[in-house]
Amino acid sequence: MNHFSNCEKKIGRADITKTEEKLSITLPDDFVSHYLQFNGGTPEKSWWDGDEDFEPVEVAGFKPFVYNSQTNNDPRSLIDGCYISMLDREVIPKNLLPFANDWGGNFFCLDLDNYSIVYFATDSFDEDLTMQENHIKLQRYLTNSFANFVNGLVAEED
């Protein structure tokens, strides 16, 4: 079990349902269960090191559904507001829901097509490519489910 600190106020299923309806999406049970326990926050074990072809990446924090005391509830710091803002600016494709970020502002996303977890490297944007080509190039598959992602995070010394 991976514990989280600096979480926002607890939320109920109705808060998540409201976001699902607003975004016209359905979230997987493991994602919902996690957020009912931890609304955002910082994982105790924060490093993803699941692939020998890539450097490990650290999760700086998970985005809350509602309430963000660190940003005075700035809508862009919440799951739905970040998603809408990134879609409006064409930063991410429609099927990726950012739920966490690393220290460089890159996103850990839930792929809404199959509920896998994808790392999206916004800091590697290539101006010579089209937006669609960038959307493909900047994605790195991490694992097949949210639960596997959270449980697969390790402490730095591991």
Where are these regions (language model features)?
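Short, surface-exposed beta-strand/loop micro-motifs that present aromatic residues
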Residues: 106-111
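Compact, glycine/acidic-enriched structural inserts
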Residues: 124-148
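Active-site donor-binding loop signature of nucleotide-sugar glycosyltransferases
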Residues: 101, 112, 122
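A surface-exposed partner-binding patch
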Residues: 1-104, 154-158
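Catalytic Cys-His active-site segments of thiol-dependent hydrolases/isopeptidases
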Residues: 118-124
